[in-house]
Each structure stands twice: as C-alpha cells, then as structure tokens.
Amino acid sequence: MKLFDKNERVLKRYWKRVKKINEINLSNVPFSELILNMEKIKNNITGENIDDYLVDVFAIVREIAKRTIGLRPFDVQLIGGMVLHEGKVAEMKTGEGKTLVATMPIVLNALLKKGVHLVTVNDYLAKRDAMWMGPIYLALGLRVAVINTQNKSYEVVWKNKELFEKAIRENLSVWPEGFAEEFLPDDKKVNTDCFDVELKEITRKEAYECDITYGTNTEFGFDYLRDNLVINLDSRVQRGHFFAIVDEVDSILIDEARTPLVISGPSKTKASDYRRFNQVAKRLKKDVHFTVDEKKKTVVLTDEGIEYVEKLLNIENLYDPEHVNKMYFLLNALKAHHLFKKDVDYIVNNGEVIIVDEFTGRLLPGRRYSGGLHQAIEAKEGVPIKEESLTYATITYQNYFRMYKKLAGMTGTAKTEEEEFKQIYGMEVVVIPTHKPMIRKDRDDLIYRTEEEKFQAVVSEIKKRHEKGQPVLVGTTSIEKSERLSQMLKKENIPHNVLNAKYHEKEAEIVARAGQRGAVTIATNMAGRGTDIKLGPGVKELGGLLIIGTERHESRRIDNQLRGRAGRQGDPGESIFFLSLEDDIIRIFGGEKLEKIMNLVKIEKGEPIYHPMLTKLIERVQKKVESINFAIRKNLLQMDTVLDAQRKAIYSYREYLLSGNLDEHFYDAMEDFIERILEEFCEKEVCDTQKINESLKILNIDEKLPDTREETKKYLKDIILKRYNKKKEELGEDFSKIGKYIALRVLDENWRQYLEEVEHVKEAVSLRAYGQKDPIIEFKKETFRMFDEMMARIYEQSIVYTLNIRKITDEAEKESKKELEKLYVQHDEFSLVNRKERRTAEKKGKKRLKVKR
C-alpha cells in the first residue's frame, strides 16, 4: 500500500502542472503565431532555465500534435512527458500512447540544440515513430532523423513543403472544425496532404547532427564503438550523449543488460579443432564426466572426466598451459550440446546457425556468440564453421546508457524492477494512471502435471473461444513450442497465425489483426511489441481479447507484458496462464513443492489445479529467479565498470592522438619507457648497465652508459630524442600523418588483445569464488596489473615503431580503412567458459597507471 501512496504523492506534483497547461487555450491561436512563440522560446532557453518553459512548450506541442497528426495528448500523457523530462521511467500501460508522450520532452530538450536520442527495440519502430511524429517536429522547425541497422540513415522531410506553408498561411489542420470527441479516427481527418512526410537518405553523421535522432539501442551503442576505431576525427558520427529516451526501457536496460555490444573481426583458429572436440564431447557422459548447472549456465569437468579426456587425447595433463586451448574447445563443445538448444536458443537456416533473441523471439542474423561458442554449435549441427572472431571494442548497454547526461525510459512494465533502475541507472519509476479505467480480468493460473496435458487444455480452450468468435492471442517461450501448438491447432482445423522469429517481417501486420473477430494468433514472447491490438467490430461484446500464456517467464514483468496486450484503453479483456510441472522455471526452481501439493490433492490426469496460493508460490519462484538474474547483471556491471574506466581512458587517449599531439605522446612514452627500465635495473643510484643495454636492443641502441641513475636517464633521453628529431626531419610533412597512423595501430592492437585477455580473467576469477575470494576484488587486482602492463607495451612499441618508421603510401591507409570495414557486430553471451586459472608473475617495481586524459 505504501508503494502506491508514494506514487500518488509524486503524481500530485505533476497534476498541478497539468492544470497550468490546461489553463492555456491555444485552439484559436493562428498556426504561424504558435511557431513564432516556439522560436522565441528557442532563443531564450538554456540548460539552467529549461524547467521554466515546460508548461508553455508542452501546451504548444499538444496543440501542434492535434493540428498536424490529429492526436491531442490527454492529461495523463502530459504527466508521462514530465516524468521523462525529469530523467525517470514512466510506466504506462499498453495502448496509452507512449509514442506521443515522448514528443513533449523531446521538443523541450531538443530546443537546447545538443541532440536528443529516441531509442527503440527495432528498425521498424524507429522508422514508424519518426515518420508518425515527424510532422510535429518539422512544424516546430526541428530536424528529425532515423538510423537503422543496415547502416542507412534518413531525414524526415515534408513531402510537399509548399502545401505545409499553405497550411500555416491559411491556418489549416487535420482536425475538422466542430469535431468535439477526444479521439479523431483516421477516416475523419482532413487536409492530411499538407502534413505528409517522407524519408530522404543522408549520412550517419548528418543524422546525428539533426535535433532528434530515432534508432535502435544496438545502433547507438555500435556507433559509439565505431567512433572509437576511426583513424580520422572527421570520420566520427556521434556528437555527444546529452538526453536519451528509451522506449521499452525494461527490455533494453534490464533484459539485454547481460548482452555486451561487441565489434569484432576474424581470427585464425582452425575449423578442424572444433570438429575434433565435437566428437570428444559426444563421448562424454553427463553427470559422470561432467556436470551442467542450468541456473548458472556452466559446465564443469569431473575428475573422472579429466582422466578420460587425457586418455582420449593422449596427453598427461589437461591443465598444462600448453593444453589450455584444448580445455577451451572441449568446454565450448559440451555447452553447445547441453546448454544451447536448436529452435530455442538458435535455428539452423541454409547451413547457418542464427541466434534467437531469448527476450523477443526474433532472429538475430549476423550476430554470433563469442569465445568460440558459435563455432562449437556449428560443429554440433554439422554446418560450415566460420572463423572465430576477435574483439576490437566492447561495451555493455549499462555503461553505454549511463554516459548520457540525462536518461529516461518508458514501458508498460517497470515497477517490479524499480530497485534495479534506481541502483544501476539512478532512475525512479513513476506509474502513470490510465486514461480510462482498466477492466481486464486476470484469472488464476491453471497447473497441469505434464506439458502434453497443458497443451491439450490450451487447444481445448482456444477451440471453445474460437467457436464463439472471441479473438485469442497465445504467448509461447520458444519457436519450437509455437510450432508444436500450431500443429495441434491444424489437426483441429482452427485457422491461426504464427508470429515468431522466423516470420518477423509480417510481425506488425499480424499483431494489428490479432483483435479481429475469430482471430487466433500464436506469438513468441513479446514479438510485435510497440504495435497496438485494436478490437474489431463486435469483439467487446464477446469479452474482448483473450490472452493465453503457455509458460511463466523468468520475470513477472514479461508475463505482465503479455497480459498487457489485452484491455487497452478501457477495453474488456481476459488473461489466463496454463502451466505444467515440466515447465523450465517450475522444474528448475520450484517443481518439488508443487508436485507435493499435486500429490496431496490427488489430481486426475488431464485435470488442472488452481488456487491463489499456487499463483503466489509461482510468483515467489519468479522473484527468486529475478533476484538471481539481478545479481548476475550487477556482477557483470561491477566488472564492466572497472573496464569502463579503462575504456574511457583509452578512448580519451585515442582522441588525444587523433587531435595530432604526437610530440607529447612520444615524450610520455619515452618517459615511461626509461622510468620502467631504471626501476627494474637500478638499485638506488647504481644501475646495471649491461642489463639496461640488453633492454635497449629493441631500439638498436648499444652505447656505453653512465653508472648513475640520473645520468643514465638524461643520457637515454638525449639519444632517443636525437633519433626522434632526425626521423621527423627525414620524413618532413609526412611524419605527422605516419606517426599518428602508427600510434593508433599500436594502441588499437594492444587494446584488442587486452579485451580478449579480460574475457579469460572474468572466467578465471569466477572460479576463485570457490576459494572464498571475492571475484570482483580479484578482477580489479588482475585487470589493474594487466592494464598497467598493456600501457607499458603501448609506450614501448610506440617508441620502437616511431624510431623505425618509413614512408607509407596512401594505399596503406586505404588498407587500414578496409580492415575497419571488415569488422562486424556481435551478440556476446555472458561469459560461460570455465578456464584453468593462469597465474602471471608480478613485475618488479611499483604499479602506475599513466594515461593521458
């Protein structure tokens, strides 16, 4: 009860502002005057006084929306807009008009000319929403663009600018005069041709220079990573991270938080290794040679398994450093066979393994699991094995979105994850009231003994409802289960649509028809998110849309999303979940308790058991799973936060190099290089000149050195600087271009290798938890040491390569750009490979982190 009291208190403050907005009547103000008023605000608004203009801007946007697209934001939508402007999460039920809500805070913040990003879950929604809301922005003199995953970018422009200018002169509107209802149907709109828009292709950089940019979460993240791989500052596309509104915020910031964005390129591992270890994995017996933990998604070899593998491979010690790769191949092969299922985690299509997004059920073509896992699955399925990828750049969504100065989000379901939004992103959740009361009926769960009994009951329920014409939407958790149910419905001659990853091109169209009389739709997870299901004629009288869930998800939130497809905007609706003791979440986390209850009440075959207590028990199981997943995400974030500080240091150093500070970079490198040599080979003031000379062989320096530390330091500086200046003179104007190119290659290659090593460390430190060591502290210690060593290598190699450079042709630079184009984006599962920990001897001398900021 307290939770909602708090929400009510928060809403009171917003209602006061709504009252002020409603006091401003702009319906008789000429179009040209509205635009002029916004222009005046644009000239006076600043980051400090932005809140003072909220009431006026929201009132103008409301009126412009009514005139250009025929939608007038309701009072509750104004509240949603205020919540977003304040950098919070607005929980708004399905059908409450989140797309329109976003326009008000977008316009208000876009007036600051720093760029506002609207983040959606797919290209279709980004394009649809930018074009749908585009007339509002264009009428107010703002530029709006769309970026998509095909690396195409578009600006939304007037189809006929003269017609729009005529609309301003003659005060035309799509809203007919005298129309008094609050919602304007499409067939009643007038003058629509004055406000038609189209897309004009532009560059990615131009898209980010627009006031408002719509796009997917993956593209915004990948553009940031790509910007930090360029070899010229002009090639960067983004201009900063000021304000982002994330649509379906729970899906992007929570469900996908365990999925780092990765830019990678090809490796040199042999396909034959994967095939060989695929055969070895087939010979190992589960629970004899290895154990599988489905909760943690890990595979661990038993002692018996280790001995058996050593015998099979004819080696003495599987954990010997020279055999570490064999362990890596083997564990990946075992995971491919026992943790990744065909038609659930991936599908095989035209000889290719394509990942299925576990949250949306969509296919992710072009995305690959990293660390050799994808190749292991290809070996298992007997399809051609593609080369393994090397990581060039990576970031988690958590750390990408935390870069924004202000971050807001909207979704139909967020309150259950409020703690995570607050802890990780500093965002409060505000539940926005619905415009009309919600009258959907949510029934208690029906629980069956077996999955077969459950599906028979689902088919029987669909048949009963279909006969009376009531539309039914069935949610499943995998493609496999969608198709199983589809086959059962075919046998009963029930016409239906299947909506899953295999058919997502038709997604929006199928979802939009799901509320028509007699429609039966099977959908994987939340396929079709963002598309409203409107009820057809006569459907309200039949009870509205029936939602059937065929399994509980790991998160209550995803169940609520499925339920939320019915009962939009005060429509009637109903939801029921059909479950069985064989469902994954019940089997893994709570099956024994439920089975005891089933046995106690002696349920007959095919009969369900339903009781509010059982629904609560399942909810407790979900809360348990949610807390496990939250802990995993938090753990990942803690590790990535360590990496994030290092990433920012490297990227800031990269920018420093791109800006052409070559001399300073060389002096930094030289200072570090000399200091490390002296630390290692000098005791107080006396130095071991023989060992120093050996270290200097990489620079082709073989001189008689002074005995004291200070003199040696000065002497080395003089020699190195003399050679540096000679090289500058030798290459003339080309030196700066060549030197920058070399410095960037050295930095990028070392950072790439470092990212690969960090993945191994993540795996190794997770094993140390068994030895009562805190994995996060271990990870920090290990990566700090590794980062320090990497910086030493960067400095050393920078000196060596700079002093030995020769002229490079323009071809070399073109070749480098081609290499960058070969890099591809990748879907990276949370690290699962279990590796033998490899210890590295600590280097002598104190630790220093020397990075130019």
From Swiss-Prot:
Catalysed reaction equations from the record: ATP + H2O + cellular proteinSide 1 = ADP + phosphate + cellular proteinSide 2
Alphabetic keyword roster: ATP-binding, Cell inner membrane, Cell membrane, Cytoplasm, Membrane, Nucleotide-binding, Protein transport, Translocase, Translocation, Transport
Membrane topology type: Peripheral membrane protein
Protein name: Protein translocase subunit SecA
EC number per UniProt: 7.4.2.8
Functional note: Part of the Sec protein translocase complex. Interacts with the SecYEG preprotein conducting channel. Has a central role in coupling the hydrolysis of ATP to the transfer of proteins into and across the cell membrane, serving as an ATP-driven molecular motor driving the stepwise translocation of polypeptide chains across the membrane.
Gene that specifies this protein: secA
Protein localization: Cell inner membrane; Cytoplasm
UniProt GO MF annotations: ATP binding; protein-exporting ATPase activity
Enzyme class: translocase
